[in-house]
């Protein structure tokens, strides 16, 4: 592994530099950059999550279950809420600044060479994708949970080969200037993460989007699993005894039952149990593929 970076190198400032700021969809640049880095994504099992609403919480649920099951889990998300480092996590912990600087320097070397040799350069999100995948590979992650940044079909996270599971959250109108001005067009972009050999799990979409997702899955030889919200029973929010919780621990939980099993979430939006049910179906898809995920890990 390369030596520690110089103390005056600021990886966040480098990634956020104006030269990288662009929304140019396409996979050629990220493919080239990752090839120069040795294609670190090929060492990872992947859960790929696209959609308009609920991507972050769905990723969180899946990553937490896999970690509880004993997998070393990388999670790449966008955007961050409080700290830039939230975008790259391993086993629930943000990447540290020394690691972020070290890996960014490695990516910088190849990004600069690529720019000089080809006249083209990666975007900020492509740099981040490369940093995340390289870091996950270097620290020995077995699986990466990747949250799509924009769309899906041409998003830099779609540089991967077939994911074990492609998850599509609720689809709505978003980024219509880039993805299309109808639900159907946007659904086609989101469904672009579906590849032959993957399991597919989708939110129960409205008819126009559902038809597109089903068609994409059929073309790839896949079937689509969905959560059954008729088997979801959401209990009232419960406040915990403040004398029995540690500082920093959540004080409120939302219990729910899905398919006869009891769960709880500390994410309190009224829609969170539905996102959790979607994540549970993704975990079930992984179990059907032979992943060792005991029920005790799911209920934690």
Regions found by a protein language model. Give the residues of each.
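Conserved beta-strand scaffold positions in the cores of enzyme catalytic domains, especially
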Residues: 46-48, 73-75, 166, 224-226
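N-terminal leader/targeting and accessory segments in enzymes
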Residues: 1-53, 57-72, 81-83, 109, ...
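Hydrophobic alpha-helical scaffolding
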Residues: 23, 203, 269-272, 291
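ATP-dependent carboxylate-amine ligase catalytic core
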Residues: 21-23, 27, 31-42, 68-161, ...
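Short glycine/threonine-rich catalytic loop with a Thr-x-Gly-x-Asp
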Residues: 73, 267-280
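ATP-dependent carboxylate-amine ligase
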Residues: 1-6, 16, 159-162, 184, ...
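Acidic, Mg2+-coordinating active-site environments of NTP-dependent enzymes
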Residues: 114-116, 127, 140-148, 163-257, ...
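Buried hydrophobic packing segments
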Residues: 62, 66, 129-136, 279-286
